[in-house]
Amino acid sequence: MRTLWIMAVLLVGVEGNLLQFNKMIKIMTKKNGFPFYTSYGCYCGWGGRGKPKDATDRCCFVHDCCYEKLTDCSPKSDIYSYSWKTGVIICGEGTECEKQICECDRAAAVCFGQNLRTYKKKYMFYPDFLCTDPTEKC
């Protein structure tokens, strides 16, 4: 019973925006964000440092930079509206923050889709301690 309670708390703790971002990734790549993009390279997932390992990791670096510019927003928790039709994601109405967060997520999902051919399994679950190059600036 305790395990079920812990799982429920963890599910509630998953930010709405991250679930939306996962759906966008699925639309553009046909892959789930979890696990394919949650700990890929040096920038996909929480935090980031060093130099992006490849084009997919660069998508995550740019996404992190996009979020960084949203100083008065909560990009990991604000819920936004969007729709899609034949592989095109369209950000909907909402607050300025919601629209900007949606655009950051949309751009990253599109970037992932454009770089599917160069995705390397060796960078899945890449250990942070191997990200030793100087960190790039946004």
Swiss-Prot record:
Binds 1 Ca(2+) ion. It comes from the Eukaryota. GO terms for biological process: arachidonate secretion; lipid catabolic process; negative regulation of T cell proliferation; phospholipid metabolic process. Its cofactor is Ca(2+). It catalyses: a 1,2-diacyl-sn-glycero-3-phosphocholine + H2O = a 1-acyl-sn-glycero-3-phosphocholine + a fatty acid + H(+). One of its GO terms (molecular function) is calcium-dependent phospholipase A2 activity. Expressed by the venom gland. The active site is at 63, 105. Ca(2+) binds at residues 43, 45, 47, 64. InterPro entries: PLipase_A2, PLipase_A2_Asp_AS, PLipase_A2_dom, PLipase_A2_dom_sf, PLipase_A2_His_AS. The keyword Zinc does not apply. Gene3D superfamilies: Phospholipase A2 domain (1.20.90.10). SMART domains: PA2c (SM00085). One of its GO terms (cellular component) is extracellular region. Its EC number is 3.1.1.4. Keywords: Calcium, Disulfide bond, Hydrolase, Lipid degradation, Lipid metabolism, Metal-binding, Myotoxin, Neurotoxin, Presynaptic neurotoxin, Secreted, Signal, Toxin. Residues 1-16 form the signal peptide. Disulfide bonds join 42-131, 44-60, 59-111, 65-138, 66-104, 73-97, 91-102. Snake venom phospholipase A2 (PLA2) that displays edema-inducing activities, as well as presynaptic neurotoxicity and myotoxicity. PLA2 catalyzes the calcium-dependent hydrolysis of the 2-acyl groups in 3-sn-phosphoglycerides. Belongs to the phospholipase A2 family. Group II subfamily. D49 sub-subfamily. This is Basic phospholipase A2 PLA-N. It comes from Protobothrops flavoviridis.
